[in-house]
Amino acid sequence: MAGPLLAIGVAVVVLILVNSGSTDRRPVAAVPVAAPSPPPTPPPRKPPPEPRPKPDPTDDPWPLYGYDLARTRLFPGGAKLDPPLHVGWRFNDGALLEFPPVIYDNTLYFEDANGWASALSSTDGHLIWHRRIGTLAAASPALDIRHKLVFFTLLSTSPGARVPGNGAVVALSMRTGQVAWSHPLAPGSESSPLVHGLSVFLGDQGGTVYSFRTYDGHVNWTFHGNGSVKGGVAFAHNTIYFGDYGARVHAVDAANGREIWSAAGGDSFYSTPAVAYGRVYLGSTSGAVYALWANSGATSWTASTGAYVYASPAVADVPGLGPTVYIGSYDGHLYAYDADTGGVRWSHGGGGRIDGSATVLGSVVYYSSLGSNTTTGRNWRTGQQVFSFPDGEFTPVITDGKVVFLIGYSTIYQMLPKR
């Protein structure tokens, strides 16, 4: 789950500074300790010849922010993960965890706000490797399982950085944490990467979207938007979709970076889109939720909340209810919208501003609240509360299909379902 409108939290090692007179996201203060820039990129190399490894069938990978390429934030068939849940192990990172980890082969990969990249055993919570690759970060990594690489974006690699600049994308070995390649991103990036085939896609603070070759960092193409691209891109039908801080949503050909369409919105887009039911769903700092037709960019519907929508949506086809979009707002409410019409199915508030994305596991939609520092789970059909936990501010949960991992302010919890 940088730089929103309001001040949202203070940790011992992390201070988030926000200009309350702007809709720009929060600059995140890093520990003022000098850290080297990522090592230089090695010469290009050919992809390894070995076949793509298959995941263990008992370990469902969660390879990128939003779970799948369309960023639906829906884990299918997760009824066995429904509450009640209890804490197994916990790992305290000591720094802000604004965005959740990714998972593969019993390992969690994540970065904290101070630019430390880590691999953690999902079985017992022990640290496998831990490497400082920058000084300021606010994104989830993404996995290239074929080449056993994990990609991180950085807002800065400069010592003591408190604002974006001199950033990078860094590819590390999933096994050892060693640098495979890196590429400088002068404006910095908080865009959670997306991997498809031999390409990794991401945006930067300067408004450029990149397609890199996964195994050596070669730049396939770049696309220049109308403003900072802070959210991640979503992928569907060989097209990537994203919003920018120039108040536009773009659809770009994933193969060559050519624009397919561009649509105007009411204000800046920090929200990472979700693509489903022929539409692109995302929130805006104007307080609106947009549903645009994926093939044209034409508006299908819009809905207004009471405040900024930095959050990203989750989408699910709910039995007895139909296709539904779940998204939180700074007005403190989680909304469930009819995905076809934008009608409100239900809404609940009271916990404080919602900044991170909702996530659906089984029949429960989870979200965290900035004001109360809590994570809440609600029945996806009725909105009835079925879970509460006293930690969490941004995007709260992921799963490997066996257990749930809950992300607090600076702590990762293994949450075990009742057997």
Predicted ranges, named:
Residues 18, 24-98, 109, 126-133, ...:
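Aromatic (tryptophan-biased) beta-strands that constitute blades/sheets of beta-rich domains
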Residues 8, 21-23, 38, 119, ...:
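Compositionally biased regions
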Residues 1-25:
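Hydrophobic single-pass membrane-targeting/anchoring helices
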Residues 17-18, 59-69, 94-116, 135-170, ...:
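Repeat-blade elements of multi-bladed beta-propeller folds
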Residues 31-32, 36-37, 121, 173, ...:
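Short stretches within intrinsically disordered, low-complexity N-terminal or propeptide regions
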Residues 73-76, 114, 121:
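Short, glycine/acidic-enriched capping/hinge loops at junctions between secondary-structure elements
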Residues 121-124, 173-176, 213-217, 253-256, ...:
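Short loop/turn segments that connect beta-strands within beta-propeller blades
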Residues 22, 40, 152, 175, ...:
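Intrinsically disordered/low-complexity terminal segments and short unstructured peptides
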